[in-house]
Regions:
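Hydrophobic, membrane-inserted alpha-helices
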Residues: 118-126
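Membrane-embedded catalytic scaffold of the fatty acid hydroxylase/desaturase
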Residues: 5-118, 161, 167-196
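Transmembrane helix irregularities
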Residues: 41-42, 129-130, 147
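Interfacial segments of alpha-helical transmembrane regions
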Residues: 131-144
Length: 196
C-alpha cells in the first residue's frame, strides 16, 4: 500500500506537471504524444483534449468550465461531477472539430477515443506484466495521482468566476510562489501565469 501511494504521489506531483506542460505543446507532435501517454498512466487520458481546448478557453465560466468548481462545492462532488463533465466537454470538443472536417465524431480520428484506447492498453499491459497484485498497486497509485491532479485543479480554481467576454488574467486562478512546490510541479503553482 505504501509503495502504491508513493508511486501515485510521484506520478501526481512530478508526472502531472511534466505531462501538463507537454500536452500544451500542440505544435510539437512528439511532446504531445509523450504527454498523452504519460497521462494514460494515471487516468488522465482526456486531459490533453479538454484541458487545452476547453478549460483554457472557458476558464472560470460557470457551466462551461468543469475544472472551476463553484463556491460551496465539496472536493468529492467536484471529483465525480467534474470528471464526468470533463469527459462530456472533451467529446463535445472532438465532435465539433470532426464535424467541421466532415468526419464522424465516433471515428478513430476522435482524440478522446484515442485517450480511452491508450488507457485501456496501459491497464492491459500492467495486468499482463504483473497480474492482480501489480494491477492493484498500479490502480491505487493511478487513483492517488488523479486525486492530486484534481486537487491541484480544485484549489487553483475554487470559487473564482469570469464573465463571458472578460479577458483571462492571473486573478482568475489562485497561485503559489513556493519555490519547492514549483520546482517539483514544473511551476504549476504559478497557475495565474500559466493561464495568461
Amino acid at each position: 500500500l505504501f509503495r502504491s501511494i508513493s508511486l501515485g504521489a510521484l506520478l501526481g506531483v512530478s508526472g502531472t506537471g511534466s505531462c501538463h506542460e507537454l500536452t500544451h505543446r500542440v505544435n510539437s507532435p512528439f511532446d504531445l504524444w509523450l504527454g498523452r501517454w504519460d497521462f494514460a498512466l494515471s487516468f488522465g487520458t482526456n486531459f490533453a483534449t479538454e484541458h487545452v481546448y476547453g478549460h483554457h478557453k472557458n476558464l472560470g465560466l460557470v457551466g462551461r468550465d468543469p475544472v472551476s468548481p463553484k463556491r460551496g462545492t465539496g472536493f468529492y462532488t467536484f471529483l465525480t461531477d467534474g470528471q464526468l463533465e470533463q469527459w462530456r466537454n472533451g467529446f463535445g470538443i472532438e465532435k465539433t472539430r470532426l464535424e467541421a472536417a466532415g468526419k464522424n465524431s465516433l471515428s478513430i480520428h476522435n482524440r478522446v477515443i484515442h485517450a480511452w484506447l491508450r488507457g485501456g492498453l496501459v491497464i492491459s499491459l500492467v495486468f499482463l506484466a504483473s497480474g492482480w497484485i501489480g494491477f492493484g498497486i498500479w490502480f491505487i497509485s493511478a487513483l492517488v495521482s488523479k486525486y492530486i491532479l484534481e486537487g491541484l485543479n480544485f484549489f487553483s480554481h475554487y470559487g473564482l468566476i469570469r464573465l463571458d467576454g472578460e479577458p483571462i488574467t492571473s486573478r482568475n486562478t489562485f497561485s503559489s510562489c513556493n519555490p519547492v512546490g514549483n520546482y517539483f510541479t514544473f511551476n504549476l503553482g504559478r497557475h495565474g501565469t500559466h493561464h495568461e
